[in-house]
Design a protein with these regions (language model features):
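Short glycine-rich phosphate-binding loop at a beta-alpha junction
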Residues: 82-91, 97, 251, 386, ...
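Conserved catalytic core of nucleic-acid polymerases
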Residues: 212, 269, 325-330, 334-337, ...
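Short hydrophobic beta-strand that contains or immediately precedes a catalytic carboxylate
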Residues: 5-7, 111-112, 382-386, 617
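Active-site-proximal helix-loop-helix substrate-binding element of RNase H-like nuclease domains
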Residues: 32, 40-187, 415-434
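Short amphipathic alpha-helices in soluble, non-transmembrane regions
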Residues: 590-598
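Flexible helix-coil linker/hinge segments at domain or subdomain boundaries
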Residues: 600-616
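Conserved "right-hand" nucleotidyltransferase catalytic core of DNA-directed polymerases
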Residues: 1-36, 40-48, 127-131, 142, ...
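Metal-dependent catalytic core segments for phosphate chemistry
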Residues: 17-38, 42-54, 384, 391-425, ...
Length: 632
């Protein structure tokens, strides 16, 4: 792999505009310079004091105020010479090029992200992560400490000739360090993890384009939802006042005052503490308390109503007003969690200088009235492709449990199976009754779904009761929770063996790897007492949850070469689903064809493994996220 490092410096006419590539389209932002760097065995060095520690040298250079043609020339040269373009947070750089009108040239090239390579090598759960920042300056300080601080003295605003040249030199140094670090990281990756890296990197142009394009949102629907939610907030607060007349909105919005109310005045038992040792009142704590105390349930209802109003109505309207083009732009982040999942950030900056560029897309509620405000662009339809039973199927593969594997075959229903086992009734009869709309059968299947989705990660009996009450509206007695917990272990006997195997591997090697090659670093035994449970849980959860992320990246890599046949585009991704937009005239065919493609991904070619089961994809289409209909 021949690398060419690439880095842009940008500016804009408004605060934060220099970090918003879509502003190029309106002329409100621009690239002030870009720099490139390559290893050069001939020893030619454009920047004399930026040299590589190996025998090779670096040929580097930069261009001030590049034109579209200048950027096109660079991209065309890389394509013709079969170079892989590497950046640091490469999606950002690629997005600026796409905004300049160079979509075709960006897609024609291979891309890599040095920052993500570093994450692959050092990936760890939050509890044991040593690296707190994956910025380029942090990497230079860690691997080339003698050269740290090279950014000192750079003025990013001054326009005198000396300052401009100093910024250009800094830009070139960024490119050189990106090249050196990427080369170092690649040399430390074995073949299987490298496969995961390259598949992930194949998605960079698609994610960059989605960053520029944004997501259409209906301000009218967001405002209508807001009116409904304000009434919900009003009613919820009336309930709060009936419960305790001394409670005010200020108390409910202050963690300190809320803690004093719950654990002081009301005498409830704290569930956990914050980093400072104070009793926590986060969502998990309130969910737990609400499951057992009606007063806490009312407080939770109020806080959720207030949060829903702000997050799903007010913030949408604020983002639409800020962007000014009918779109919200939550910023997608590849490999954002330790499991590899993509997430979205909704804002830039903090406090009074906060820029509401997007919405909290990865936290969006399921209700149709919430989702209907997310629409396809005019003339397009929204297509959703969702991996059916994704985590259940991967647990079946990892645990090799024969019952689980059988339940992944066509015509089977794992939730009805578990529901029948819990209720001690006939599985096939329950399936039939569910299909006929029998409410009793549906309730039994719901218990089966609770068991299947909650217990495969070693959930305790007590936690199962909380999940049942909060997420499913099912109050369970201790005896019922115990029976579901035991039934799960009886039906899927290989799953507890998988748990033990993963804990053993983690303690022996300190590393867990999924089937696609993605790794997480834990620590070799002996483990401190306070980390034993979270580390063993990571060893169990990671192969299942992370392979779901890699399955998504593989799907996107396949779609990169497929969508153009339908004039379709990647829109966003969420949980188990991928969202595509296609012209209305081609949407039906695209939905059917892409469903077939995604249901038969090239796992053997990509990961070198033969899977014992299929991973079918469900498809939906419609004008908005809240109006999607199934595609058969």
């Amino acid at each position: 792999m021949e690398l060419t490092a690439f880095d842009v410096e940008t500016t804009g006419d408004g605060e934060w505009y220099g970090l918003q590539p879509w502003r190029v389209i309106t002329g409100d932002a621009r690239i002030t310079s870009f720099a490139t760097a390559e290893f050069d065995a001939s020893g030619s060095v454009v920047v004399p004091d930026v040299a590589c520690e190996s025998k090779a040298r670096i040929r580097a250079g930069g261009l001030l105020n590049p034109t579209t043609e200048g950027a096109r020339k660079f991209l065309t040269s890389c394509h013709e010479r079969k170079r892989t373009i590497v950046g640091w947070n490469t999606t950002f750089d690629a997005a600026w090029l796409i905004a300049m009108g160079l979509r075709e040239e960006v897609y024609a090239n291979h891309w890599l992200d040095g920052m993500l390579l570093w994450k692959h090598l050092t990936n760890a759960p939050e509890s044991t992560r040593l690296i707190k920042s994956y910025g380029l300056k942090s990497a230079v300080a860690r691997y080339y400490p003698q050269e740290a601080g090279y950014e000192a003295g750079v003025d990013f605003d001054a326009m005198d000739r000396a300052s401009v040249q100093k910024r250009l030199r800094y830009n070139i140094q960024d490119a050189c360090f990106t090249l050196r670090l990427t080369d170092l990281f690649l040399s430390n990756l074995s073949e299987l993890p490298r496969r995961a890296v390259l598949l992930e990197a194949a998605c960079i142009p698609m994610v960059a384009e989605a960053t520029v394009s944004g997501i259409c949102a209906s301000g009218e629907r967001a405002a209508a939802l807001g009116e409904k939610l304000r009434e919900v907030v009003r009613i919820a607060f009336v309930k709060v006042k009936i419960t305790d007349g001394s409670v005010t909105p200020e108390i409910l919005s202050s963690p300190k005052q809320l803690s004093e109310l719950l654990f002081g005045k009301w005498g409830l038992t704290p569930i956990k503490t914050t980093a400072t040792g104070a009793p926590s009142v986060d969502k998990e704590v309130l969910d737990t308390l609400a499951a057992f105390d009606p007063r806490a349930a009312i407080l939770r209802e109020y806080r959720e109503a207030v949060n829903n109003l702000k997050k799903f109505s007010d913030n949408t309207l604020a983002s639409l007003a800020y962007n000014g083009d009918g779109r919200v732009r939550p910023a997608p982040r590849i490999f954002s969690t330790y499991t590899g999942r993509m997430t979205y950030s909704s804002k830039m900056g903090t406090g009074s200088k906060e820029a509401p560029v997007g919405i909290a897309l990865h936290q969006w509620k399921r209700g149709a009235e919430y989702r209907a405000q997310i629409t396809a662009p005019r003339g397009y339809e929204l297509l959703e492709f969702d991996f059916s039973g994704q985590e259940f199927r991967w647990m079946a593969v990892e645990s090799r449990d024969q019952t689980m594997l059988k339940l992944c075959e066509p015509g089977e229903d794992a939730h009805s199976y578990m529901g029948a086992a819990i209720a001690q009734c006939n599985y096939r009869h329950l399936m039939q009754a569910v299909a006929e709309g029998d409410p009793v059968a549906d309730g039994r299947r719901k218990l089966g779904k609770l068991g299947n989705l909650s217990l495969q990660y070693r959930t305790s009996r007590q936690r199962l009761q909380i999940v049942a009450k909060v997420q499913y509206g099912l109050p369970l007695t201790d005896e019922e929770s115990e029976e579901i917990w035991r039934t799960y272990r009886r039906q899927y006997q290989n799953v507890p063996l998988y748990w033990k195997r993963q804990e053993y591997l983690a303690k022996r090697t300190g590393v867990i790897q999924n089937l696609a090659g993605r790794m997480v670093n834990l620590m070799q035994a002996p483990w401190p007492d306070h980390l034993t449970w979270p580390l063993s849980s990571t060893a169990i959860n990671f192969p299942i949850q992370s392979i779901g992320a890699d399955q998504k990246y593989l799907a996107l890599a396949v779609l990169r070469n497929t969508l153009s046949a339908y004039d379709a585009y990647f829109y966003f991704e969420l949980h188990d689903g991928l969202f595509i937009i296609a012209p209305r005239a081609k949407a039906e065919k695209a939905a059917h064809d892409l469903k077939a493609v995604l249901s038969d991904l090239p796992y053997k070619k990509a990961w070198g493994i033969d899977l014992p089961i299929k991973f079918p994809v469900d498809a939906k289409r419609g004008p908005s996220w809240g109006e999607l209909k199934g595609v058969k």
